Amino acid sequence: MLFPRVVPFQSLRTAFQKKTFLPVSSAGNVFTPRFQLQAIRSIWIRSEETPNENALKFLPGLDILPPTIGSCEFMRGQGTVNSPLAQKLFDIDGVDSIFFGKDFITVSKGAGTEWAQMKPEVFSVIMEHLSNGSPVLSEEPLKGASDTQILESDSQIVAMIKELIETSIRPSIQEDGGDVEFRGFDEKTGTVSLKLRGACRTCSSSAVTLKNGIQQMLKHYIPEVENVVQVLDPEEEVAIAEFEKFEQRINGNKQKADNK
């Protein structure tokens, strides 16, 4: 996994002292992507490998989500999936999770399946869905990528953390088919809580990226930051546990078949 690119971030604290930030409403509109397919007669989808061998990034050459939503993720077994496209992709054996970025889709698979069999099906489902003008989301997720919008109630340190994530860290993470979500800052311990999403969530090098990449950059520009930790939502922990049980059953059945 690539580390976030280091870009000039001079006079950060001075800039925030002079800058005024307006409060941001959490309200949003349900996304119905009519605009994205009005002029499309044929869609050309390309795929890119990610640092996570179990995740592929698919780029259809059009915006999947509007800026008001940013990104959203669905995992097998999480319950309600407010995405017709994600529901279709989950019908493919082996699909573990679906991540929608602004203009890309990251599909993650279980360790016991092969892309050679899955990839053509994924291409077909995405192509058919987008070509028909079907909505990507049936309603807006409860949590979007508005985590780095600077609020009037944010402290100067939190505002700087959000700005650095949005301008320097997030673009590099998205290149790898994932995203990073700001979950909070504990001023007493200097701990930044982040959630890795998409291809980065299950990548074997995610811990290295978190500590040697993101943490190093935040500590360099913001001395108040002492540590960066990854967090999971309760429903995500349950979904991961259930999928691991499912994979264990599949692998167990394969071993029994091989021993016969």
Curated annotation (Swiss-Prot):
Alphabetical GO CC annotations of the entry are: mitochondrial [4Fe-4S] assembly complex; mitochondrial matrix; mitochondrion
Which residues does the annotated region (NifU) include? 161-231
Source organism per UniProt = Schizosaccharomyces pombe (strain 972 / ATCC 24843)
Query: What name does the UniProt record give this protein?
Result: NifU-like protein C1709.19c
What molecular function terms (GO) are annotated for this protein?
4 iron, 4 sulfur cluster binding; iron ion binding
The alphabetized list of GO BP terms reads: iron-sulfur cluster assembly
Q: Which Pfam families match?
A: Nfu_N (PF08712), NifU (PF01106)
What is the phylogenetic placement of the source species in the record?
Eukaryota, Fungi, Dikarya, Ascomycota, Taphrinomycotina
Q: What family name appears in the similarity comment?
A: Belongs to the NifU family.
